[in-house]
Amino acid sequence: MLHSLILKLKWLVSCRKLLGRQASYYPEAAHKSRLRIVHDQLRFFFKYGYLEEYYYPYGFDRAEMTRAQMGEYIVPYRAFLYRVDQLNFQNPGFDAYEGRMTGRVLNQDKFYFFLFLRQLGYPTPRVLLYVRGGKDLYADPSVSSLEGLFSTDLDAFAKPVGGMMGAGGFRLQVRHGEIRVDGNVTTAESVAARLVSADYLVQDYVVQHERLSALCPSCVNTLRLHTVMDQDGKVHAFGPLLRIGRVGNAVDNWAKGGVIVGIDKSGRLFDRGVMKPGYGTVTVEHPDTHVVFAGYELPFYHEAEAMVVSLHRLMYRNHSIGWDVAITPHGPVIIEGNDRWEISMIQAVHGPMGHLKHYFQ
């Protein structure tokens, strides 16, 4: 008990910047005093053991934001993330023994995820090569081996098989013997050294629909869709949003400076995008391409939502999943299913999600 308290106090000290004033995501509103902000955060800490890391993206700094209104949000972020993780480790829809046979491996191992989806006939990028322990564990016949990867014209994306938040991912292009990583000319030796430095998956690069490319052409901009399975086995979709990268970046992740925008029931974007603290606040248009978000229609949105709901029914050992779905000219393609998705992105664009709490008790 004492050890746990000491650890939390150390974490509180490391997060002391959260007690100060930061850039507001609602600059037009009247704001709380620093004393009120500190009071709110300390109340979170003593009630839950954590500060609220997304206090400002949620607009808690607005003077009009009451304690009751803050209570409509799922807070604090970190405690809920642990709860999501716990439920995906042992889905309450199973008994204690069955629940230990977790389905998380299908989400956390991107190679297994690919095999599972391909067997079921769901569209997902083809795996060209899987490098594990410094050796090519699996190679598609089109490349045959790690060395063969560089003797075939290809457009691919490489990522760590257990990676998160876009870390380590890069675009790989080979054409007439010229090799490029994220657009820059390089050598086969350099790429090979990078691939054997971790367990890497190399997949076909997804060509996105022109409506998505217009927002940011340098990366694949993906829908982030969320589903949760109740104890009766029914799957519910919630909190849809679009992740948009920044020009020059190979990934669209919020943690890499990307912009997230909520999606309404008709498949159109909300009127403002949100950036992660440290990268900016809000914007009504893309910072680089200047495409206005309000009412921007996304193709194949309803097809994408129906696809992930049907797939979650088959991944029944997962309690909840955050899906990354690309939109191509021919329809949705499932990139990943994340078992440690973040409520912060959803509430930053959709507002309070307290009505979902009963699924996570």
Regions found by a protein language model. Name each.
Residues 134-138, 165-169, 234, 248, ...:
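Short catalytic/ligand-binding loop motif for oxyanion handling, primarily in non-cytosolic enzymes
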